[in-house]
């Protein structure tokens, strides 16, 4: 065992003394040492229930014959960090989390890991660490929140009933009393936000990848099932250690293709593009950005999930969960191993029935193509990403007038000030991985766009990214970004921009000679943040089309 490095031999007397100083008895020293990386915090509703899950994981580890050690991992709530300086830190924490898990596991020679996670950047950061370390690992996602409940059966969700409600109030569609009702009911308790936003999409993809047990991706945070899954995960990690099953045996090219297909079939968050690219890189799997679009063209969207659709995570779980989606996708799913020991196809074969009102058959899809499309053109030579499942039919092809803003705050001021009108294309730039820095989510502008009723007449393009709660004609991840001198930096007020999602095009309708002249006089702006770790991050982070990872190269 790896932990024998710190447990065996006369020269390890000091190490054993320190371990015994934590209360570990001699009788337990020969057992596998299992690290439980817990991202508990009472700052985030998605993580407040983790103390309970920690107990069940620990019980499972002891039942399986291991010894559990807990260590803490930070968590940032994107919703709370949204719309201010805090959002600069969200995506970069993904890298910090991966580095922290690696550091603790290597420094203490842990035999295996249980990664307790839930919200947006924490789950991919944990998975990056698992792939990098390649020691036996299982992931427990803490589960989605229940829908908020109102009179006459009304169900509330976080994004629709907060960010979009705020804009509806500003537009005079609802009054202050209704806005207060939304605020009080949008988040009824523990769990990740109720729709197919980034946290829940990543939980689903973690299960699809084979890194968590069946139903873990959809079982509600408040459920007894979630606690049983936590216990079973604790037992299973000891089995994985004894059998030498490691993440790179599970995180194969086939596993990533399966995850992408499930993401596309459900209409998941566009953030998953960044995260899957980053995880694949750590796993040594070649996964070009174009893969998402290739699979999108042959994978129908078979569920209508909130925020763009009607169903919540609790509906998806009751309808069959991830294995139900695998069953409906049938032969397009490749056989790939999982931590349970069964392959993906074997798991799908165990499903007896699926609620086809929620998870439709591929013969009767919600849309013929998957939820995400990758666009290219002279505005995005290295690509851009759109969650096409959230775009209305009239906006799938659109041409409009550029309105340019060099930060999210400036764009929000224009939107809330009534300065954006039908036919505009809102351009938000210098918000990429380097330029932000941190590639902030543009949820406030996109939700405002929808709340003001402009979702069928105004598009938004950015080198930043979007929340999983975003819907509407919003194109992000434009690469190269403005801070690197990408074409988005050359757009000027009044330019015409053409969006053509069916044909995967994003074009700036300006003659190349004019763009060349603009390029000759372009000067990179001063960094927005010059001190602290974000200043270091901006120097080493890569472009969105490679996953916005940090590298020493």
Swiss-Prot record:
One of its GO terms (molecular function) is 2 iron, 2 sulfur cluster binding. InterPro entries: Dihydro-acid_dehy_C (IPR042096), DihydroxyA_deHydtase (IPR004404), DiOHA_6PGluconate_deHydtase_CS (IPR020558), ILV_EDD_C (IPR056740), ILV_EDD_N (IPR000581), IlvD/EDD_N (IPR037237). Keywords: 2Fe-2S, Amino-acid biosynthesis, Branched-chain amino acid biosynthesis, Iron, Iron-sulfur, Lyase, Magnesium, Metal-binding. It catalyses: (2R)-2,3-dihydroxy-3-methylbutanoate = 3-methyl-2-oxobutanoate + H2O; (2R,3R)-2,3-dihydroxy-3-methylpentanoate = (S)-3-methyl-2-oxopentanoate + H2O. Binds 1 [2Fe-2S] cluster per subunit. This cluster acts as a Lewis acid cofactor. Mg(2+) binds at residues 78, 120-121, 441. One of its GO terms (biological process) is isoleucine biosynthetic process. [2Fe-2S] cluster binds at residues 119, 193. Its cofactor is [2Fe-2S] cluster; Mg(2+). The keyword Iron-sulfur applies. Pfam families: ILV_EDD_C, ILVD_EDD_N. Belongs to the IlvD/Edd family. Functions in the biosynthesis of branched-chain amino acids. Catalyzes the dehydration of (2R,3R)-2,3-dihydroxy-3-methylpentanoate (2,3-dihydroxy-3-methylvalerate) into 2-oxo-3-methylpentanoate (2-oxo-3-methylvalerate) and of (2R)-2,3-dihydroxy-3-methylbutanoate (2,3-dihydroxyisovalerate) into 2-oxo-3-methylbutanoate (2-oxoisovalerate), the penultimate precursor to L-isoleucine and L-valine, respectively. Homodimer. This is Dihydroxy-acid dehydratase.
């Amino acid at each position: 065992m790896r932990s024998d490095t710190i447990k065996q031999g006369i020269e390890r007397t000091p190490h054993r003394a320190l371990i015994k100083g934590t209360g570990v008895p001699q009788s337990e020293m020969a057992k596998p040492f299992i690290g439980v990386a817990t991202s508990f915090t009472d700052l985030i509703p998605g993580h407040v229930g983790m103390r309970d899950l920690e107990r069940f994981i620990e019980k499972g580890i002891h039942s399986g014959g291991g010894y559990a050690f807990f260590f803490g991992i930070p968590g940032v709530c994107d919703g709370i960090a949204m719309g201010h300086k805090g959002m600069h830190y969200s995506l970069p924490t993904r890298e910090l989390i991966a580095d922290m898990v690696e550091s603790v596991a290597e420094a203490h020679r842990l035999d295996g890991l249980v990664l307790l996670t839930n919200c947006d950047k924490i789950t991919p950061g944990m998975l990056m660490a698992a792939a990098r370390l390649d020691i036996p690992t299982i992931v427990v996602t803490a589960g989605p929140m229940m829908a908020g409940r109102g009179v006459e059966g009304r169900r509330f969700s976080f994004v629709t009933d907060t960010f979009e409600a705020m804009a509806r109030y500003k537009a005079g569609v609802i009054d202050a009393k209704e806005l207060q009702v939304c605020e009080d009911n949008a988040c009824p308790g523990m769990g990740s936000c109720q729709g197919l936003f980034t946290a829940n999409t990543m939980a689903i993809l973690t299960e699809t990848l084979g890194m968590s047990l069946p139903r873990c991706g959809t079982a509600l945070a408040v459920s007894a099932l979630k606690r049983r899954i936590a216990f079973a995960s604790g037992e299973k990690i000891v089995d994985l250690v004894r059998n030498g099953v490691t993440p790179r045996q599970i995180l194969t090219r086939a596993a990533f293709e399966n995850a992408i297909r499930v993401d596309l079939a459900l209409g998941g968050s566009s953030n998953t593009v960044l995260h899957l690219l980053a995880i694949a890189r750590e796993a040594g799997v070649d996964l070009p950005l174009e893969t998402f679009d290739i699979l999108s063209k042959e994978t129908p969207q078979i569920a209508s999930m909130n925020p763009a659709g009607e169903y919540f995570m609790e509906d998806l779980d009751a309808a069959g969960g991830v294995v139900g989606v695998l069953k409906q996708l049938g032969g397009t799913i490749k056989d790939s191993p999982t931590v349970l020991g069964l392959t993906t196809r074997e798991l799908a074969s165990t499903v007896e029935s699926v609620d086809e009102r929620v998870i439709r058959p591929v013969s009767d899809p919600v849309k013929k193509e998957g939820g995400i499309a990758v666009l290219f053109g002279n505005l995005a030579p290295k690509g851009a990403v759109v969650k096409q499942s959230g775009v209305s039919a009239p906006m799938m092809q659109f041409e409009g007038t550029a309105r340019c803003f060099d930060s999210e705050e400036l764009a929000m001021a224009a939107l809330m000030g009534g300065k954006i009108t039908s036919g505009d294309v809102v351009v938000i730039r210098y918000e990429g991985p380097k330029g932000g820095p941190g590639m902030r989510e543009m949820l406030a502008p996109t939700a405002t766009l929808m709340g003001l009723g402009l979702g069928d007449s105004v598009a938004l393009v950015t080198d930043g990214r979007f929340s999983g709660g975003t819907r509407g004609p919003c194109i992000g991840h434009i690469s190269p970004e403005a801070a690197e001198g990408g074409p988005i930096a050359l757009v000027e007020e009044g330019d015409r921009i053409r969006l053509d999602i069916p044909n995967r095009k994003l074009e700036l309708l300006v003659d190349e000679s004019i763009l060349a002249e603009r390029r000759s006089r372009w000067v990179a702006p001063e960094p927005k943040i010059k001190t602290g770790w974000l200043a270091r991050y901006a120097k080493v982070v890569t472009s969105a089309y490679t996953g916005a990872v940090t590298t020493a190269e």
